[in-house]
UniProtKB/Swiss-Prot annotation:
It comes from the Bacteria. Signal peptide: none annotated. This is Conserved virulence factor B. The gene is cvfB. InterPro entries: CvfB_fam (IPR014464), CvfB_S1_2nd (IPR048588), CvfB_S1_3rd (IPR048587), CvfB_S1_st (IPR039566), CvfB_WH (IPR040764), NA-bd_OB-fold (IPR012340), WH-like_DNA-bd_sf (IPR036388). Gene3D superfamilies: Nucleic acid-binding proteins, Winged helix-like DNA-binding domain superfamily/Winged helix DNA-binding domain. Belongs to the CvfB family.
Amino acid sequence: MALDKDIVGSIEFLEVVGLQGSTYLLKGPNDESVKLNQSEVADEDDFEIGEEYSFFVYPNRSGDLFATQNMPDITKDKYDFAKVIKTDRDGVHIDVGLPREVLVPWEDLPKLKELWPQAGDYLLVTLRIDSTNQMFGRLASETIVESMFTPVNDDSKQNEYISARAYRLLRVGSFLLSNEGYKIFVHESERKHEPRLGEEVEVRIIGHNEKGELNGSFLPLAHERLDDDGQVIFDLLVEYDGELPFWDKSSPDAIKEVFNMSKGSFKRAIGHLYKKKIINIETGKITLTKKGWSRVDD
């Protein structure tokens, strides 16, 4: 039976018409047959046959129409950030708050696979229903972001570091959106590497335009550039995946062997890196921060 595309991916009032085993049978506005797993009922004591309730309607992988009372933040009419669960040859699988995951097809992702999102990243998406009534994730277009971002029309954010996620990647630069809703553009000349789609990055604000869009940079200010000892430590941290088993109480001989510097020089260097929020100093180790990783070149 073909599904009614009009109700798939949206919140609808459906009538409960019966119970078959552990599955409630529902009827849509155009007499569509919709199933509801009994475990999906929020309050069964207040759930009666013959009554209408609000549900989110979605297809399972076999094409059967199901409903849930757990309303997702993302529908076919609403955009939001969704967490990436995994990546495979078909594309990126995301969690939109439904009993099943949703696929963003590989055709909609960057051509360079190293720029694809990784598990734990977040994508700004809505739901798309295709001609076979299957449900996919659709990335937000520039037009959509322009309709929802929060403009900044003064210099209040100048030189501030802001956490934001990449929602669009072009050769000319990276387009980011922050949790506060700020839209940020980083020109290719202001970055050493390109962030992944959906990756959270730290960006320094360097200006704004007449539309209230912010301009950003991944490059450090001149006074934030590292001295020779700091650069040695930073480069080794990058080489060893952001973590080294050294701290201010490590032995002078071990420091000399690995970093070729005195313990005093090492302590001064990691102190400067810590003050610049490039590293964290923990018991027995130093690690790169998000700000530190933002300095990394390809």
